[in-house]
Amino acid sequence: MGNVQSEPSAGGGSRKEQASDRASDSRRTPLVEPEVTPSSPAMRLARGLGVWFPGSSGPPGLLIPPESQASSSTLPLTLELPSPVTPPPEEAAAAAVSTPPPPPVGTLLPAPSKWRKPTGTAVPRIRGLLEASHRGQGDPPSLRPLPPLPRQLTEKDPVLRAPAPPPTPLEPRKQLPPAPSTCDPQPPSRRITLASSATSPTESQVRHSSEGQAAGGAHGEGEMARSATSESGLSLLCKVTFKSGPHLSPTSSSGPLAAKASLGASGGGGLFASSGAISYAEVLKQGPQPPGATRPLGEGPRAAQETEGGDGDGEGCSGPPSVPTPLARALPPPPYTTFPGSKPKFDWVSPPDGTERHFRFNGAVGGIGAPRRRTTTLSGPWGSPPPRSGQTHPSSGPRRPTPALLAPPMFIFPAPNNGEPVRPVPPSPQQIPPLPPPPPTPPATPPPAPPPTPQPPALPRTPILVARPPTPGPGHLESALAPTPPSTLSPTAAAEQAPAPTPAPVTSQVPATTTAELSPPMPQPKIRTRRNKGPRAARGVIREEGTSGDGPREPNMAPVTDSSSGGGGGGSNGTSTAGASNKGTARHWPPFEVLNSCPCKCYCRHQRRHRRLPRNVSAWLSTPTNHLSEPPWVATVKLAGSLVAGLEHYDLQATHST
């Protein structure tokens, strides 16, 4: 069982698969033969367990009657595990075979042991993992193709690798100790078309032995041909019915998948091993797929775990999806869907429909550091909370103000799109007085959303419900800020919501917001300005004044004024139009220009005084002052050297010449 346990390191399905790999090391190489090979550890194990092999006419000790193997009718295979904690794999398997407990593993999928989960103790599991690592089977299944046929672990029955081919077979997933009992109950409805016997904790082994028997009996060596063998036929072989009922956990879905995977990969194991993600994903799909067996309550979580890569350990119960592989496959598992995207990504990307994206775009499009920073900052409040309505706004209110301060809001939501200058409230405060009135009107119109889209910055996408203009100065700023969150909300609602959270931040940015509100003509240029400057704004309103060549420059104006100008020397030119549009812009972009022109506030090589060497350096570099024409430290070094050398006389000239 422990071997069956999948490696934690391997991705979801791959872990179990790995376990099976390491379990069936010898089998792994020959897809078909190894399982049957009497000498193979799996074989011995299976025999010990009482697994019936293809050579045998019937399963020696297995519960699965030959009839069950032969007939496709689902056989309620009740391999009982003596206890959730599996005895040593062989013992456990034997016990399972001897005492078929109610919980049979759901899936008989022979291919990847990865799907089979030993219900047994973690120790065996760990041991299996270690074993696998030593064998070199620890590699993620995805990396190394593993013949699904031989997937049975060393302790597992050697048999079922071959049966894996049948898509119908459900790979038995070990249920966790508690789950097994539940799993068992699944009526034959869970018949495993796969020639595998499902068992519980030990079932993994027993299951394999069963599978081996079934596969062996039906297929004889054919189990080796598992992939060649018709999947349905194979499933016949080990028509083990796992009564997994709802308990069958993702494993149940796993079975068909495993079978399918084995078929897909010439070496059943290959599929699982080679594409751990796929098999795992498929298993997930199948998990939901096997409607026949109600997923255990834990199934959903299990599936998720599987997706996460928890597949190996987490799945306590292995439910064989009675549903044929096609069906199982047809059903994409919700977990799998999640699986494709990393959770973190989905968490912040998915929820913030527009806000996060806007910020991100600002960063990407603007190409300015500030936007990136903003994204991070807003990531929590903006990105995290899906609510773009008032809720989002309040939560991000403090942070959002920062965005508002940044030009991004303004140029993100260009008023021009709607033709309402108010939309891009975020412009610099300069516009506050002139635009306050217009913003009020825009608030009514939610169309701002489209204008934001035009804006390069993603942020603007949310219409700036700068309509917030209620307050001519700060009010507008707030509105501009708020609009981003409210974009989702109706303009009015957004405007209303934005004001509360935004006010504080807006206060600092108020002028900028007002500027944004300025007039539709400005919006396009502003967009550019906003974007470039947005980062600066994000860094802080102060940054504008501080960064600017001239400290006196008003911070408010700077942010609103050409953010693009501020962003880059070239930007200022581009924003000149914007500047013209924004009354404050004309005054403010020069600061940005000043920055580019280096107004002596910065320490740069353009200024003579900055190029001068330090006084002490120039002093010793000037021959008239320093007869040695060498830095004082050189003389000191020489003196020290002479002292060390024990020279009684320190001759500067001699030392120098030397």
Swiss-Prot record:
Biased segments, Basic residues type: 527-536
Cited InterPro entries: GGN
Residue stretches of biased makeup (Pro residues):
163-188, 423-460
* Compositional bias (Basic and acidic residues): 14-30
Residues spanning the membrane: none
Q: Where is this region: Disordered?
A: 1-268, 285-584
UniProt signal peptide: none
Gene Ontology terms: biological process: cell differentiation; double-strand break repair; embryo implantation; gamete generation; protein localization; spermatogenesis
Q: Does the keyword Aminoacyl-tRNA synthetase apply?
A: no
User: Can you name one GO molecular function term for this protein?
Assistant: identical protein binding
Composition bias type Low complexity, residue spans: 54-83, 252-264, 398-409, 489-516
Sorted alphabetically, the keyword list is: Developmental protein, Differentiation, Phosphoprotein, Spermatogenesis
Q: Which residues carry this modification: Phosphoserine?
A: S384
- UniProt region (Interaction with GGNBP1), positions on chain: 127-491
Residue ranges, compositional bias (Polar residues):
194-204
Q: Where is the segment annotated Interactions with ZNF403/GGNBP2 and OAZ3? A: 496-658
Quick one: a GO cellular component term? Answer: perinuclear region of cytoplasm
Q: What is its quaternary makeup?
A: Interacts with FANCL, GGNBP1 and ZNF403/GGNBP2.
Record's function text: May be involved in spermatogenesis.
Question: This chain belongs to which protein, by name?
Answer: Gametogenetin
